[in-house]
Amino acid sequence: MPKALIVSAGNNANEYLAKHMVELGYTRPVMAASGGEARRQIDTKDFEVIIINAPLPDEFGHELGTDAVTKTDAGVILLTKAATADQIADKLQEFGVLVLGKPFTGAQFRQ
């Protein structure tokens, strides 16, 4: 069964993201509330997809994204405010991190 990691400090965002991940076939996404917690999960489990809802309480999240790309085979998506997404998308995409600006539609997320 494919595994997904959702890194987000917000309960509402967690529920929303988990719902969409279930629709994509990730039946029990693993949740992490911080970058540190996510790194511990990444060190002990294999994930197919890692979703980072920036900012996180202990870091912005772009560092976690680049770390995850270099340490795993997972696809990594960073969710951030649209204005910030425009500023960081090119740099992060060089590393292989997909950046999606918030707000976004369910259809955009599932793409």
Q: What do these predicted ranges mean?
A:
Residues A9, L79-T84, P103:
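Conserved active-site segment of CheY-like receiver
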Residues N11, A33-E37, A107:
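Acidic phosphotransfer microenvironment of two-component signaling modules
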Residues N11-V30:
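Two-component/phosphorelay signaling modules centered on CheY-like receiver
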Residues A18, M31-V49:
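Acidic, metal-coordinating helix/loop segments flanking the phosphotransfer/catalytic sites
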Residues S34, P57, A82-D86:
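Negatively charged, flexible loop motifs adjacent to catalytic sites
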Residues V49-T72:
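Conserved phosphotransfer microenvironments
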Residues E63, K81-V99:
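Alpha4 helix (beta4-alpha4-beta5 surface) of REC/receiver domains from two-component response regulators
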Residues Q87, F104-Q111:
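C-terminal output helix
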